Amino acid sequence: MTSVPTVSDSKRAFYAAYPRPINPLYRRVVEELLVEIHLLSVNTSFVYDPLFALGVVTAFDSFMSSYRPIEAVGPLFTALTQAVRQNPEQYRHDANAIAEQVRGVGSDTIRQWLTEAEALGNAPELVRSSFQAIAGRSEFKYSRLFAIGLFSLLETAAPDLVQDPEALKTTVTAIAERFHLPSDKLQKDLDLYRSNLEKMEQARITMEEAIQADRRKREQREQEKLAKAAAAEAPAALEASSDNPEPETSETPS
């Protein structure tokens, strides 16, 4: 009988795959995602689908968008997904594929697909199969990452929809009713996700301002050091000049 990996096992695997230092602000994001994906992946009710992949990719990319160096973001995602025994290439591929199938279709169309039983059959393949599977399961394992995937799907289909709080709430409630999802929890998870994005951005700005202030202080100290050195050299140069007066030139009488 194969033992189920623990959260500690997944964390060790992650830090073995990515041993470099991670900024504390972003390390918390990565660890929370790792724990969440781990707990879902070992749950017998969990079933992977492109919508979940979209949620994982969206959450990671959104929270890590300001991470520096930017070249480290890809390896971080790879280490994260592989640590929880998932395939990073599949996640990226499936997330991009389902998003592209709804890009720009508009709020009316996406609402019809996801709230009217007959209309779902007209939806693109990945959207149709993902939501038909949800409807057909006797026990669907809801998660925050599913909620983020749904939000990203709506945002990709109709950016104006997610900018209108009332329209978004009405749509999410209708989708929850259609697929027997926990409406209140779904709405709270989306509100929390958006709130956390704002907090993350504010923290990033504060951190950047602190870095800039520290850089200015270092530059100022360096300038002051150079000024003091120049001031100390000036008297010595003046003294050397007075010790070596230029010889007088005598005029030749005409």
From Swiss-Prot:
One Pfam family this sequence matches: ThylakoidFormat
GO cellular component, one term: plasma membrane-derived thylakoid photosystem II
Keywords carried by this UniProt record: Coiled coil
Bias-annotated ranges (Basic and acidic residues): 213-227
GO BP term, pick one: photosystem II assembly
Domain of life: Bacteria
Positions with biased composition (Acidic residues): 245-254
Annotated region described as Disordered, given as residue ranges: 213-254
Coiled-coil intervals, chain numbering: 183-217
Classification via InterPro entries: Thf1
Signal peptide residue numbers: none
Keyword Coiled coil: yes
Presence of the UniProt keyword Iron in the record: no
Low complexity compositional bias, start-end: 228-240
Function: May be involved in photosynthetic membrane biogenesis.
Alphabetized HAMAP family for the sequence: Thf1 (MF_01843)
Membership in a protein family: Belongs to the THF1 family.
NCBIfam families recorded: PS_II_psb29
Designated name of the protein: Protein Thf1
Organism: Synechococcus elongatus (strain ATCC 33912 / PCC 7942 / FACHB-805) (Anacystis nidulans R2)
